[in-house]
């Protein structure tokens, strides 16, 4: 009987301990910063952001990574 319960106890205990450490939610500020950084990098890769002279009605800074807001960045 002990042979049956020992592996069962070990598997339940290890799942509980591992589940508590692996399933921790990511803190929201860190996740938000990561998403914003990805969005800025995606906008910086836009073809308009790399041009110094934009089409009429568009606004682009000369430095691509600074291109955070504006129609040409989306």
Swiss-Prot record:
PTM comment: Contains 3 disulfide bonds.
Segment forming the signal sequence: 1-19
One Gene Ontology cellular component annotation held by this UniProt entry: extracellular region
GO molecular function: potassium channel regulator activity; toxin activity
Purpose: Inhibits voltage-gated potassium channels.
Propeptide stretches in the record: 20-41
Keyword field contains Secreted: yes
Family (UniProt): Belongs to the scoloptoxin-07 family.
Subcellular location(s) per record: Secreted
Residues passing through the membrane, by range: none
Superkingdom assignment: Eukaryota
Lineage, broadest ranks: Eukaryota, Metazoa, Ecdysozoa, Arthropoda, Myriapoda
Main location: secreted
Tissue and organ expression note: Expressed by the venom gland.
Keywords linked to the UniProt accession: Cleavage on pair of basic residues, Disulfide bond, Ion channel impairing toxin, Neurotoxin, Potassium channel impairing toxin, Secreted, Signal, Toxin, Voltage-gated potassium channel impairing toxin
Keyword Ligase included in the entry's annotation: no
Protein name from the UniProt record: Kappa-scoloptoxin(07)-Ssm2c
